[in-house]
Amino acid sequence: MREMAEDIEEIRRRKLMELQRKYLEQQKAQEEAERQQALIEAQIQAILRKILTPEARERLARVKLVRPELARQVELILVQLYQAGQITERIDDAKLKRILAQIEAKTRREFRIKW
């Protein structure tokens, strides 16, 4: 009877250690993913600082407050164009407005209510 209780206790202890190990592994993986995401975001922001004028960056920041998905799409497109060498001069506020309008027109969804 005593051996059985000790065996059960040993099984519980092993299971607890295994769960703790898995939890620590998941936590480390999550921290690594967050660190990678922060690094990518820092790289994106560095590129945007290079290619956007201060006024254009301010406009993009305001767009991000209202339409974060649109702002993110514009950021990624600008970074891709920069990396492909297609952006040769800084983008000012007027150019950014045109880019935003073009992307908005392509992604706009129309809702029609019929009576």
UniProtKB/Swiss-Prot annotation:
Keyword DNA-binding belongs to the record: yes
Q: Which InterPro entries does the UniProt entry name for this protein?
A: DNA_bind_arc, PDCD5-like, PDCD5-like_sf
The domain of life for this entry's organism is Archaea
- Extract the GO molecular function terms from the UniProt entry: DNA binding
UniProt GO cellular component terms: cytosol
Keywords carried by this UniProt record: DNA-binding
Name the family: Belongs to the PDCD5 family.
Q: HAMAP family annotated for this entry?
A: dsDNA_bind (MF_00026)
PANTHER family from the entry?
PROGRAMMED CELL DEATH PROTEIN 5
Q: What is this protein called?
A: DNA-binding protein PH1060
Species, as recorded = Pyrococcus horikoshii (strain ATCC 700860 / DSM 12428 / JCM 9974 / NBRC 100139 / OT-3)
